[in-house]
Design a protein with these regions (language model features):
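Active-site His/acidic residue clusters
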Residues: 1-10
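Non-membrane alpha-helical structural segments and their capping/turn regions in soluble enzymes
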Residues: 10-18
Length: 169
């Protein structure tokens, strides 16, 4: 530990944050979120680099997404650009993993007696808590979609599956 409050490989992580910010700048005019495990706590340089590039961290206020050696913090973040901020209805961390006992950890399969008696559940399915993001996508003034053709009961009239995803305006 270098004693500077930064995690391992700080210069590399700052460079990665800069590269992400440069890439995401292409979408500045579109609502864009940067979401995931940034492997940096909120006061570390990589997070500060994203904030300096104009990204607002909209997650994690007082919430922990990760626990290591009994100490909690947040390595998982949600950042929004100015175009995305009006769409946010809420952001929170779902405390389903990090605070659970390591005895229940997903990677310990075969070593845990509890797996023989417990039903499948989301607890300790990762070592990080997921971020939950609420979005308001359609306002009250949005027009209702209109069908492009009359519905048919003939199964042959259905479009055939395609390997290419379709674009939705």
């Amino acid at each position: 530990d270098s004693g500077d409050g930064q995690g391992n490989a700080n210069a590399i992580r700052v460079a990665q944050a800069g590269a992400l910010a440069s890439f995401a700048a292409r979408f500045a005019d579109k609502p864009t979120l940067l979401v995931g495990d940034f492997n940096s706590y909120s006061q570390e340089d990589p997070i500060k680099a994203l904030e300096a590039a104009g990204w607002e961290r909209v997650s994690g206020a007082g919430e922990a997404s990760y626990v290591y050696a009994g100490r909690s913090g947040s390595l998982d973040h949600v950042f929004a650009n100015a175009a995305a901020k009006p769409l946010l209805a809420g952001v929170t961390s779902w405390a389903v993993n990090a605070q659970e006992s390591i005895a229940f950890e997903y990677s310990r399969a075969g070593m845990n007696a509890h797996l023989a008696v417990e039903a499948d559940n989301p607890y300790r399915s990762s070592d990080h808590n997921p971020e939950l993001i609420g979005l308001t996508l359609l306002g009250g003034d949005a027009p209702a979609p209109t069908p492009s053709a009359e519905p048919s009961t003939d199964p042959s009239a259905a479009p055939s599956p395609s390997a290419e995803p379709s674009a939705v305006p």
